[in-house]
């Protein structure tokens, strides 16, 4: 069975909710590839930041949401690609991350992460950098056959305690 990109959304959404819950967080993720955001999601955006939705009318992350731990609420955006990751995909995810001030921006591909992208991120540091050490910008290889995450670059944020303190 050949799956299309949108067929992966709910699978990946569920997998990430499980990962956030494994870190003791309450997670809410919704599929937003249709450029529609629920009132529940919008209610977590500060009033002064609602202007971001003007810029999301034409393009939006595939999956958008937030997670709560204690009194903190942080945003997460997930972009899914059923093709090899390209540099333009990374900048697309960065744009969404900046608009939402996302703690985590994840670019998930059903193809292995290209060695060239990994090499580029080592010589052009800003490619995967985040505004803060407490924010993660991560490339992820999702194996559709086993329905599992196989590779995280530069690191798996769910295994780094710095993000969860």
Regions found by a protein language model. Name each.
Residues 68, 97-98:
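N-terminal cationic-hydrophobic initiation segments that often serve targeting/anchoring roles
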Residues 84-85, 89, 98-143:
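Nucleic-acid nuclease catalytic cores
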Residues 62, 91-92:
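Well-ordered alpha-helical segments embedded in enzymatic catalytic cores
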Residues 26-74, 85, 147-162:
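Active-site metal-binding core of divalent-cation-utilizing nuclease and nuclease-like domains
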Residues 1-30:
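Nuclease catalytic cores
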Residues 78:
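Conserved beta3 VAIK motif of the Hanks protein kinase fold
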Residues 3, 7-10, 121-165:
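Intrinsically disordered, low-complexity terminal regions enriched in charged/polar residues
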């Amino acid at each position: 069975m050949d799956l299309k990109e949108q067929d992966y959304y709910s699978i990946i959404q569920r997998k990430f909710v499980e990962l956030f819950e494994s870190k003791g967080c309450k997670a809410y993720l919704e599929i937003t590839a249709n450029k529609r955001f629920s009132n529940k999601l919008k209610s977590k955006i500060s009033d002064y930041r609602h202007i971001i939705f003007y810029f999301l009318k034409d393009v939006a992350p595939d999956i958008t949401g937030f997670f709560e731990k204690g009194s903190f609420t942080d945003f997460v955006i997930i972009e899914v690609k059923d093709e090899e990751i390209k540099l333009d995909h990374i900048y697309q995810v960065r744009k969404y991350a900046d608009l939402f001030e996302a703690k985590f921006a994840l670019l998930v591909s059903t193809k292995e992460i290209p060695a060239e992208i990994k090499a580029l991120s080592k010589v052009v540091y800003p490619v995967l950098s985040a505004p803060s050490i407490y924010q993660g910008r991560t490339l992820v290889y999702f194996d559709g056959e086993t329905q599992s995450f196989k590779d995280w670059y530069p690191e798996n944020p769910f295994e780094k305690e710095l993000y969860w303190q």
